């Protein structure tokens, strides 16, 4: 029998709301208020998000972020910097105790990413899972060369034509798995790299060249322009098939929405942003 999960598309929201909603959904699942949930969303303004452990002032050119009019937010998940602009962002929130969820992060990535794999199939792309096979490849993941996400695929992230097309991060808190990630529609590589600090211009140019070889957006390889709506439809169906689930629409209570608002204040605060 097909399991029924919640589905919510919160549309285009500010970065603090986006991170607050993901954390709030984790809380609601942890407390048993709602069933597992898949969420889609986009960003307004376009935003640079940094990982929980990244050192903001050392790695990010904050003035450049402001100059370009981008938002800036710290995620509750690890990983590196991501420019959320022309993309579909997804989150999956499910109890660690769920019978289909493995106990290890990498294996849970694989299960959840089946939904992404099927979504790309629906758009006509033959994607596959990245599996770092050599010790050198695994060591590179432990010590990334840059602060920019998408410059190398991690375990079970999606790759097409040898380049990473979706980047995800996962955290486990309060007995719940939260995995969220970016499915790139288009990407502005120059803007992305301008917002990070590098030791010198030569290194920046080398990292940018490496990035172009390692990352790709949907419309870079599609024969026709794929819209956000087409992506939403493809990945909604993809998650249903990949996880063998069906959806019911999620409607939050007034009390739950108040919790989202309280968490939004947390993500907006300098104490959170400058915590590292």
UniProtKB/Swiss-Prot annotation:
The family this protein is said to belong to: Belongs to the octanoyltransferase LipM family.
Positions annotated as active site in the UniProt record: 149
Described function: Catalyzes the transfer of endogenously produced octanoic acid from octanoyl-acyl-carrier-protein onto the lipoyl domain of GcvH, an intermediate carrier during protein lipoylation.
Top-level taxon in the UniProt lineage: Bacteria
Disulfide bonds: none
Domain BPL/LPL catalytic: 32-247
Keywords annotated in UniProt: Acyltransferase, Transferase
Further facts: In the reaction, the free carboxyl group of octanoic acid is attached via an amide linkage to the epsilon-amino group of a specific lysine residue of lipoyl domains of lipoate-dependent enzymes. The reaction proceeds via an octanoyl-thioester enzyme intermediate.
Stated name of the protein: Octanoyltransferase LipM
Any GO molecular function: lipoyl(octanoyl) transferase activity
Site (Lowers pKa of active site Cys): 164
InterPro entries reported in the protein's UniProt record: aa-tRNA-synth_II/BPL/LPL, BPL_LPL_catalytic, LipM, Octanoyltrans_LipM/LipL
One of the GO BP terms on file: lipoate biosynthetic process
Catalysed reactions listed for this entry: octanoyl-[ACP] + L-lysyl-[protein] = N(6)-octanoyl-L-lysyl-[protein] + holo-[ACP] + H(+)
EC number: 2.3.1.181
Protein's pathway: Protein modification; protein lipoylation via endogenous pathway; protein N(6)-(lipoyl)lysine from octanoyl-[acyl-carrier-protein]
Quaternary structure note: Monomer.
SUPFAM superfamilies reported in the protein's UniProt record: Class II aaRS and biotin synthetases
